Amino acid sequence: MAQAKILIVDDDQDIRRLLGIRLKSRGYEPVFAGDAISAVNQARKEHPDLILLDLMLPAGDGYLVVERLKAMPALEGIPVIVVSARDPVAEDERFIESGADAFFRKPFDYDELLTAIELALGTEPAA
């Protein structure tokens, strides 16, 4: 079975690197984007199995990224997990309208995020 490809979108290079290392150690193939425009371009190019998306990005809002991706037939079924420092309660309406699948507030618990990734991908939790 091929590795699941996960697009990590965050303007913080340290977060991208850390998540990439952790996900790669669990058998996932991480790909990266640091802003809204590259997120859409990378998604088109890489066709990831899942997207981890920050909301506060250069060159556009994370919700606009979700809306653009969900509007593309080739990408509309890709699960999107938002990982942001924003307050999820304050973001609730926009989050629901965007079509994103889950919301984690930074700092997040990596094991909980991993469980959400596995559920979204329909894979068994790694031992």
Regions found by a protein language model. Give the residues of each.
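The feature encodes the CheY-like receiver
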Residues: R16, P58, E76, P88
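Charged docking surfaces used in two-component/phosphorelay signaling
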Residues: R17-S25
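Short hydrophobic/Thr-rich beta-strand motif most characteristic of the beta2 strand and flanking loop
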Residues: G27-G34, Q42
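Residue-level signal for the "D+5" position in two-component response regulator receiver
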Residues: F32, L57-G60
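Acidic catalytic/metal-coordinating carboxylates
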Residues: D35-S38, D61-E67
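Active-site beta3 strand of CheY-like receiver
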Residues: E46-L52, L57
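Alpha4 helix (beta4-alpha4-beta5 surface) of REC/receiver domains from two-component response regulators
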Residues: L64, D87-F104, D111, T115
